[in-house]
A protein has these predicted regions:
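Accessory interaction regions appended to the cores of large information-processing enzymes
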Residues: 1-161
Length: 161
């Protein structure tokens, strides 16, 4: 049941009650337990996360960072709604112009980010990811930070199989 409690609470939106009783130990069946079914949203750039870029990324999945958070290349900033990992630019700022209009600059409303606890972060990790724990924060990142090097390593791993 390790890793299932978070998924259960998400499915029931916090209203579920879960009880369990130990029955017996059984041998592990490969592929039966764990694993994340969705990919990660990975930052492509280093800098501060902006509200402008978070608004466009929200459509693609769940965000883990607040606006203004320092991010770096290879850092996992959210969970993709699909199975593959998606590299996104969360540091992109809005272009400023001299032309202003009343309807153009609307108030930006974004969803509250999902802040992962230590246990949730451990559940989220895949084989190619690391977790950094500091007194201030818990960050998830890819083992290989550079996007191009990650792609080369994935091709090499695929050809070796």
């Amino acid at each position: 049941l390790i890793g299932y409690s978070t998924e259960f609470l998400s499915m029931t939106r916090g209203y579920g009650i879960m009880n369990h009783t130990f029955d017996q130990y059984l041998p592990l069946i490969p592929g039966e337990i764990g694993g994340r079914r969705r990919g990660a949203l990975v930052s492509i750039d280093t800098g501060k996360a902006t509200t402008y870029s978070i608004m466009s990324i929200e459509e693609r999945g769940t965000i883990f960072v607040n606006p203004g958070t320092e991010v770096y290349e290879g850092m996992i900033i959210g969970e993709n709604s699909r199975e593959n990992d998606l590299t996104v630019n969360i540091t992109k700022a809005k272009q400023m112009t001299n032309v202003r209009s009343a309807t153009k600059d609307q108030t930006a409303v974004i969803k509250t980010p999902r802040i992962l606890t230590l246990e949730e972060s451990l559940e989220f990790l895949n084989d190619d990811e690391y977790m950094e724990v500091t007194p201030e924060s818990i960050r998830l990142r890819k083992q290989i930070l550079d996007k191009n090097q990650r792609a080369k390593a994935a091709k090499k791993k695929k050809s070796a199989e």
